[in-house]
Design a protein with these regions (language model features):
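Extracellular beta-strand-rich solenoid/capping regions of secreted or surface-exposed proteins
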Residues: 45, 49-53, 66-95, 105-131, ...
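Feature marks extracellular polysaccharide-active and adherence modules
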Residues: 60, 97-99, 107, 123-124, ...
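Bacterial Sec-dependent N-terminal signal peptides
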Residues: 1-21
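Extracellular beta-strand/beta-solenoid scaffold signature
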Residues: 72-84, 111-121, 143-152, 168-176, ...
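Acidic, glycine-rich loop-and-beta core segments that form the ion-binding/anion-interacting portion
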Residues: 243-254, 258-269
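Right-handed parallel beta-helix/beta-solenoid
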Residues: 18-46, 63-65, 100
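Loop/turn elements at helix/coil->beta-strand transitions in domains of secreted/extracellular proteins
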Residues: 21-22, 53-56, 92-93, 101, ...
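Parallel beta-helix/beta-solenoid
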Residues: 52, 86, 91, 101, ...
Length: 314
């Protein structure tokens, strides 16, 4: 059922290289090891501490049950599980990928920092490539209005997120506020519902959120992605200050609690913009014109395609 969109990524892909270092992480590894195929690290945190531009981290298959003491950073609002703050270069990306046809899964069920939003992959680095793994059971602990994110691109540019699945948790699948020229390719977000905050309304759990906070954050793309059974919207561009492109994507069964048709949040398939209806909302100097093309919406709770009063239309 997966719809793969072809794109020429060979020159920026992850592959075994003779001119850079390849590190390995495995469920039976040890962070005192050398990080080789035969003696892998145990954690992605250890591998990330070693990489330089051009390196690749291969993550062996299996389930990685993440613990709170493994968190790499945070601020007054968020806890960062994996703080991806190292950058590659245009010629030498840093890659984090499932090994060959193996499918690693990061399980966040035990990460419940009190009073904090959870950002599983907090990405401020640039020229990174994340590929072929899953993030499950991301938690929410705050009772008031809040959110958690499986992937939060906060300042990273020229990143690729490919063939990832963010599912069966309480968090937004992918969320961008700062950064330019980021490609989210062939990724899935599904079965995500927050029963904890705001009495379980589920109104802040989108599949994919593109919300660039500056007109300079251009060139961001969702391509070949699917969103279903997210308790709010499938794809949401509300308050975006720069144009976003959504291409060849699917949105279905959003706005419901997973597994049935019990209503939860807004339930729009593709919510392409808008700045709210309050009289004091600050508009950007130039309203961005989002592009949504070759996309499919089916049986979302509210609308399939909705400009959300966006002055630039779609």
């Amino acid at each position: 059922m997966k719809k793969h969109i072809g794109i020429s990524l060979f020159f920026m892909g992850c592959f075994l290289s003779l001119s850079a270092t390849n590190y390995f992480v495995a469920t039976n590894g040890d962070d005192s090891n050398a990080g080789t195929l035969d003696k892998p690290f145990a954690t992605l945190q250890k591998a990330q501490s070693k990489v330089v531009p051009g390196d690749t981290v291969y993550i062996r298959g299996g389930e990685y049950r993440i613990r709170e003491e493994q968190m790499m950073g945070g601020d007054h609002l968020r806890a960062y599980v994996f703080e991806m703050n190292k950058s590659g270069t245009q010629a030498k990306r840093i890659c984090y990928t499932g090994y060959q046809d193996e499918r690693p899964i990061f399980n966040l069920a035990e990460v419940k920092p009190e009073g904090k939003r959870v950002s599983v992959f907090y990405v401020s680095g640039s020229y990174l490539h994340f590929r072929n793994f899953e993030i499950i059971k991301t938690q929410v602990t705050i009772r008031e209005h809040t959110q958690s994110e499986c992937i939060y691109n906060q300042g990273g540019n020229h990143n690729i997120y490919e063939n990832l699945a963010m599912h069966d948790g309480m968090a937004i699948g992918f969320y961008l506020v700062r950064g330019s020229n980021n490609l989210v390719l062939n990724c899935d977000a599904y079965n995500n519902y927050d029963p904890v905050s705001e009495n379980g309304t589920g109104g802040n759990v989108d599949g994919f959120g593109g919300h660039p906070a500056s007109a300079s954050y251009t060139g961001n793309v969702f391509k070949g992605c699917r969103a279903w059974y997210n308790s709010d919207d499938g794809f949401d561009l509300i308050k975006a200050q720069a144009a976003y492109t959504i291409e060849d994507c699917w949105a279905f069964y959003n706005g419901y609690k997973p597994g049935g048709f019990v209503g939860a949040g807004d339930g729009t398939g593709f919510k392409a913009g808008g700045y709210g209806m309050r009289s004091k909302v600050k508009m950007p100097n130039e309203i961005p014109h989002h592009v949504v093309k070759n996309c499919l919406a089916y049986k979302n709770k509210n609308k399939g395609f909705y400009a959300n009063h966006h002055l630039g239309g779609i």
